[in-house]
Every structure is written in C-alpha cells, then in structure tokens.
C-alpha cells in the first residue's frame, strides 16, 4: 500500500528533532545511529530478496524501520529483530504476506550464513517467534496504524516521463531514490516529491546531463513540486554525496556494480524489477527509452496541463555546478568508479542493466527501425500485390507517391516469374477505359468495314426484289423457299470481336425489319412525320412517357388505311423486355429452334414445317414488341437522337411499321444513330449502313445478333461510353 497522498506531517522531522532522537539521548552518536539504520535497511533488502517479495514491500519495510526508531532507541530494540518485524508487517500490508516461520528462517540465514538452518522445534526459534509477534504489535502502535507509505519512486517515474529522459537517466534516478532510503534519513525530513527532484538532479549531475527549461519558461522541478528550488536541490545533493563518502563499502559496491552485472546473465526488462510500479510504467513498457546516452531525444513533448521540454543534453565535464571543490571531488571520484549512468548495489536486482548492453539494444532498435522502413516496403510486395501498401509505408511517407509505378513493375515481374502460385497476378482482368478520340477512330474503322459489306448486301437484296416482285400479291400465304445466311452475321461477329478486345461495350444490334409494300412517296411522308414526332418526343422525354405522340398515332392510322392486312397493329403493346441482351424477335426464334442469324420469310419456312397461321402469330408478337421498343426508347433518348434528324426518324419508322414492305430498294442513308435498349443496357450505336432488305419477296426481316453482353463494373464507365457514342455525329 505504497502511495496514499497526503501523509501526516507527524512523520516529517526537523534537523533538531533528528539530532535529538531516543538513540542520541541514550548516548548513541549520530554516525553510529546512521550506520545502524543503514545496516537494518541492508538486512531488510537481503531478507526481502530471499523471501521473493517486491521492491515496493522492501521499501515500505525500510520506512517502517526509520519511523520506528524515531520513537525508540537502538539500545532497547535490536535492529535485526526490528528489521524482521518490519518486513513481516510490510509483506502483509502490500498483500505479499509470508509465513512467520519463513521470515524467521530467512533472518537467521542472513545473520548466520555459516550455521545450519534453524530448527522449528528448538528454543531459539520459539523465542524469536514470540518476540516477532510482540514487536509487530508494538510497531503498529508506534506507527499509529498509519501503514500507508508514500515513496519518491512514483514521482521519479512521472518526472522522467514528463521530460522524456533517456533510459539511463531514468534508471539512475530511480536507483538513487532507493539508495536514499538505504543511506539517508530523507524519508523522515522531506516529502517524496522533494526526494524525487533530488534524485533526478543528482543523476543529471552524475551523468553530465542537463534538462533544459520548458517552453513555458519553467524548470523541470517546478512541475514536480513548486516548493523546490535550485538551492535546495544543490544542498540536498551535497548532503547525499557526503553520506556516500562516509560509506565506503556502499561506494565500493556501486563502483563494482558494472562488473557484477556483466558477470550475471542478462535479464529481460520485464524480469529486472519486481516492483509493480516499475513493471507497469517503466521497465516492461520501456516508456522512458527515447535515445542513446549522449544523443538528444525528441525536442518536445506534450502532456495535458503541461508544456514541452526539450530533451536533456550532455554537459561538458567542466560545467558541473557544485558548492565547493570537495563536492566536485566526490563527483569525480564517483564518476571514475562509475563512468556510466547505470549503477547500483550488487544486492539490488531491481533495476539497471549493463550500460553497453542497453546502448547496444537501443542502437539495434534504431537500426532495426531504419531497416524496417525499407524492408517492409519490399516485403509487402512479396506477399502479393493485393496487400495494402500503406501498412509498410508508415515509416517512409515519401515513398507513397511511387506506389503505382512500383506496383505495375511488380505485376509485370510476377507475370513472368517462374512461380505460378499466389504471387503471380492475372493481367487484363480490369477493362481498359478508352478516350473519346480513340473510341471515334475505332468506330470509323468499323464503319468502313460495314460499308464494304453493305454494298454486297445491297446487290443481293436488289436481286431478291426482282425475283419477288411477281409474288407480292400472294405474300401472306406463300412461303419463301430461300433460306440463306447473309454476311451481316459475320460483320456483327467481327464487331463483337473488336469490342471484346477493346474492353468496351458489347451490344446486340438488331437490324430493323422492312416492309416491301410501301411506296417511296409514303416513305417520304412518314419520314417527315417521324421527324416532327422526334421533336415532340424530345419535349416529352424528360417525363419518360410510355405512350407515343399524336404524330405516331397519325402514322399508325395512315398505315392502317393503306395496309388493311396489317390489322394486328391495333393490339395492345406487351412489355416483354429480354434481360439476356437479345431482342424479342430473337428470343422468339430461339424458342422455335431457329438460329437468330437465319433470315427467313415471316410466314414460315418450308424446311421447318411451320404453318402460315403460327408464323403470322409469331409475327404479331414481334410487331408488338417492336412497337413497345419504339415508344420506350423514344422517350428515354430524346436528346441523344437529336443529332441525327432524318436518319434517326427513318430508323424509328422501320421499327414502328413492320408490315410495310418496300417495293424498291432505298439508297443508302447517311450514317444513323439509333438506339438499342434490350434488358438492362441502353446505349447508342452508330450505324453507317443501309437497312437490309429481306431475302424473300414477302419476307419480314427479324434478326438479332449473338454477341455477348458485358456487364459494366460501375455506372461511370457506362455513362462515359454513352457520351462518347452520342458525340460521334457532332
């Protein structure tokens, strides 16, 4: 029970009181009394180590001993039995209780190392047992049952953390706090905060370090205890050094501490001290380790309600400010025997480690940190390119900008590596984005190829029209014997291959069917009507109307008047979008077992054995789907089709008026932009070809491509392609 702040002032004595102790009144000299106190403290230390109690328990027992002899004389109470009693009581207080039997045996072993172990049945053992129990009661009464002790070690740790002291300086200061209990009566004169400042001040002078003034203009000791002054620190430091001079045995142990530590097996930081204070805040966590001795630490630190201190810096050997030359000689003598700042008793296992090992350890830690900053940067790539790079780059922020280039280089190397495990990556998974200029160039090349094939297709269509002119009247009941695959399938397969390589859109382009019975005059009239309808649908497009404009209704009425055979136009529109990316007509053909790339007569194919009634019903469904596509696409893309006035309207005329068959082939129209919107994909595709006539004299062209539909990874890519396709004719 170490630190209960606000201890009673009855346990702080003046110098006059210390010179008038019960021992002094009994004739004991001052030096003799101090020597007895030091011997009792040494016995408590040795017993505590053998009993395996914490250093906190040992320090508490030493304070009990000092306070006890302020009310009792060494001549009446033997220091050895009082030491055992104090440790026995302190172990209980600090919750590390030891059996009375063990305490007596350990005390006997320390006092009589050459004698055999004490028998528990002998009279000496029973006598010591009775004495210890009685003395425990006397000690409790003497202490006034104030068993809570404040130690300066807590303040030493706080202050060294506050100023970000080095590990050596912190260890030296902490060790001097323990020595103050062993060698001096500071615990009877000053508060723990004052003793802590004295220990740090002495450690700084001993190791030639200086803690500079904080940014607030305050000295470091003012943050520990405002009542402390530099004069008081120098005075107590001088007194401490004089006590060390009077104890040559202790000074000899301090000088030989390094040799003893070198001979011992190096201990882990967590095993150096058994003190809970050290284990939690100093040794195990290595909080105070900031730099190697002589190297300035972090120039500032921040604490709540405190300001920043620059790091302690080494002093020159001639700048040690002491009161007289005698103290300077003591410092030089101690520094000669202990040139480093880590020193201590041979019996103390609580603290310091070897100076060289500590310095080597810190150098190694700094070197390891430097190497990690470069090695982790490369290790992350050895584990695979999918690992986040920022976890290895926190030491090297200047390398973050090189992330992309290094990663691309690594991907290239991994692809050509001999190892085909998880290290190698699969290139080409992410589709590449194309700029607008590249997209236009690619589309121009595709358009030229389509023009060449269009001439061949137009020649075949003209020949088919000449053969089928005589059979126009009986077109509804006669099946066409012609079944052929036109090269347009190859054209669209070529387009699909080109698009698949470039990683852009993959579309299915249905060729709008044509009717043969419409005249050129009717076509011109319908083009004008559709053109005016396009402007009206542009106004209504923002509302996404699902119904056609009045112009379209008028268009349908004219077609009903001129083509009585097309009565199925009055049927209601069916919403039958195909989500597989193919057209409705293509889906119907696939259901019938006919490849969609085959152009056939709408009435039926003789090879399939399909009756004319079933063919006409299939034709009716396709017309409804096409009409629905016409209305929905017109409302969705009013502005995107505005750039191609007559061409877009002519395509819409083809879609909305299936039953009309042209008697004469049309000249190739200019490049048109018509909308393809099947399933989830709606985009604009540039067509630079004339609509293809059907094979037979009464054939209705129903066609859909078999190119694959590619899903977009995000909406941004789709919008980019839409805008690129829209700007083709601008």
Swiss-Prot record:
GO BP field: cell division; early viral transcription; late viral transcription; positive regulation by host of viral transcription; positive regulation of DNA-templated transcription, elongation; positive regulation of transcription by RNA polymerase II; positive regulation of transcription elongation by RNA polymerase II; regulation of cyclin-dependent protein serine/threonine kinase activity
Bias (Polar residues): 341-350, 360-389
Tissue specificity field: Ubiquitously expressed.
Bias type Basic and acidic residues, positions: 398-412, 517-543, 552-565
Modified residues (Phosphoserine): 480, 601
Covalent cross-link (Glycyl lysine isopeptide (Lys-Gly) (interchain with G-Cter in SUMO2)), residues: 407
Database matches in CDD domains: CYCLIN_CCNT2_rpt1, CYCLIN_CCNT2_rpt2
UniProt superkingdom: Eukaryota
Region ranges (Interaction with POLR2A): 250-300
Single GO MF descriptor: RNA polymerase binding
Region (Disordered): 341-430, 497-652
rRNA processing as UniProt keyword: no
GO cellular component: cyclin/CDK positive transcription elongation factor complex; nucleoplasm; nucleus; perinuclear region of cytoplasm
Low complexity bias (residue ranges): 579-588, 606-616, 637-652
Keywords: Cell cycle, Cell division, Cyclin, Cytoplasm, Host-virus interaction, Isopeptide bond, Nucleus, Phosphoprotein, Transcription, Transcription regulation, Ubl conjugation
Similarity comment: Belongs to the cyclin family. Cyclin C subfamily.
PANTHER family: CYCLIN (PTHR10026)
SUBUNIT field: Interacts with CDK9 to form P-TEFb. Interacts with POLR2A (via the C-terminal domain (CTD)); mediates transcriptional activity. Interacts with HEXIM1; mediates formation of a tripartite complex with KPNA2. Interacts with HEXIM2. Interacts with PKN1; enhances MYOD1-dependent transcription. P-TEFB complex interacts with RB1; promotes phosphorylation of RB1. P-TEFB complex interacts with MYOD1; promotes the transcriptional activity of MYOD1 through its CDK9-mediated phosphorylation. Interacts with MDFI and MDFIC. (Microbial infection) Interacts with HIV-2 and SIV Tat. Does not bind efficiently to the transactivation domain of the HIV-1 Tat.
Official protein name in the record: Cyclin-T2
Species assigned in the record: Homo sapiens
Gene coding for it: CCNT2
């Amino acid at each position: 029970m170490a630190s209960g702040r606000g201890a009673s002032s009855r346990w702080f004595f003046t110098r006059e009181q210390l010179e008038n102790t019960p021992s002094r009144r009994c004739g004991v000299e001052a030096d003799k009394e101090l020597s007895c106190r030091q011997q009792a403290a040494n016995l408590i230390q040795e017993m505590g180590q053998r009993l395996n109690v914490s250093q906190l328990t040992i320090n508490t027992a030493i304070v009990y001993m000092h306070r006890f002899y302020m009310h009792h004389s060494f001549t009446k109470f033997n220091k050895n039995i009082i030491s055992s009693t104090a440790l026995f009581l302190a172990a209980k207080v600090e919750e590390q209780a030891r059996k009375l039997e063990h305490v007596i045996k350990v005390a006997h072993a320390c006092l009589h190392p050459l004698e055999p172990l004490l028998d528990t049945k002998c009279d000496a053992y029973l006598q010591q047992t009775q004495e210890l129990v009685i003395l425990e009661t006397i000690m409790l009464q003497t202490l006034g049952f104030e068993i809570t002790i404040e130690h300066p070690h807590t303040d030493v740790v706080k202050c060294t953390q506050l100023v970000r002291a080095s590990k050596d300086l912190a260890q030296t200061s902490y060790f001097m706090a323990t020595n103050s209990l062993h060698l001096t009566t500071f615990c009877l004169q000053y508060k723990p905060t004052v003793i802590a400042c004295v220990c740090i001040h002495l450690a700084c002078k001993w190791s030639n370090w200086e803690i500079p003034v904080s940014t607030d203009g305050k000295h470091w000791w003012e943050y520990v205890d405002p009542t402390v002054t530099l004069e008081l620190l120098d005075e107590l430091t001088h007194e401490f050094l004089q006590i060390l001079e009077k104890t040559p045995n202790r000074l000899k142990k301090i000088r030989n501490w390094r040799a003893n530590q070198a001979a011992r097996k190096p201990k882990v930081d967590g095993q150096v001290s058994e003190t809970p204070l050290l284990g939690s805040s100093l040794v195990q966590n290595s909080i105070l380790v900031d730099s190697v001795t002589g190297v300035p630490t972090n120039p500032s630190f921040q604490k709540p309600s405190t300001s920043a201190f620059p790091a302690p810096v080494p002093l020159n050997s001639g700048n040690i400010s002491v009161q007289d030359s005698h103290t300077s000689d003591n410092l030089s003598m101690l520094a000669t025997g202990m040139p480093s700042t880590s020193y201590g008793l041979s019996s103390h296992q609580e603290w310091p480690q070897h100076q060289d090992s500590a310095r080597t350890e810190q150098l190694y830690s700094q070197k390891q940190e430097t190497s990690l900053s470069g090695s982790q940067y490369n290790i992350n790539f050895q584990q695979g390119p999918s690992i986040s790079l920022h976890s290895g780059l926190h030491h090297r922020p200047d390398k973050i900008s090189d992330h992309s280039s290094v990663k691309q280089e690594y991907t290239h190397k991994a692809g050509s590596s001999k190892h085909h495990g998880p290290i190698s990556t699969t290139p080409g998974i992410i589709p590449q984005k194309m700029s607008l200029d590249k997209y236009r160039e690619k589309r121009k090349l595709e358009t030229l190829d389509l023009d060449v094939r269009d001439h061949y297709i137009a020649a075949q269509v003209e020949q088919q029209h000449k053969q089928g002119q005589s059979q126009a009247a009986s077109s509804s009941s006669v099946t066409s014997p012609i079944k052929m695959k036109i090269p347009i399938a190859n054209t669209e397969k070529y387009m699909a291959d080109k698009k698949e390589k470039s990683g852009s859109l993959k579309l299915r382009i249905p060729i709008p069917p044509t009717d043969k019975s419409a005249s050129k005059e009717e076509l011109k009239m319908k083009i004008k009507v559709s053109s005016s309808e396009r402007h009206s649908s542009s106004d209504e497009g923002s509302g996404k109307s699902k119904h056609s404009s009045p112009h379209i209704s008028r268009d349908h009425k004219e077609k009903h008047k001129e083509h009585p055979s097309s009565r199925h136009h009055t049927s209601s529109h069916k919403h039958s979008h195909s989500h597989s990316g193919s057209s409705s007509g293509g889906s119907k053909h696939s259901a019938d077992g006919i490849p969609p790339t085959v152009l056939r007569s709408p009435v039926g194919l003789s090879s399939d054995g399909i009756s004319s009634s079933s063919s006409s019903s299939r034709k009716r469904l396709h017309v409804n789907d096409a009409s629905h596509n016409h209305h929905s696409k017109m409302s969705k893309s009013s502005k995107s089709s505005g750039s191609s006035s007559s061409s877009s309207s002519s395509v819409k005329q083809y879609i909305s008026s299936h039953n009309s068959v042209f008697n004469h082939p049309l000249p190739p129209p200019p490049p048109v932009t018509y909308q393809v919107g099947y399933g989830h994909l709606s985009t604009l595709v540039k067509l630079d070809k004339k609509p293809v006539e059907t094979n037979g004299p009464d054939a209705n062209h129903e066609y859909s491509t078999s190119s694959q539909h590619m899903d977009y990874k995000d909406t941004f890519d789709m919008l980019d392609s839409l805008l690129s396709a829209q700007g083709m004719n601008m």
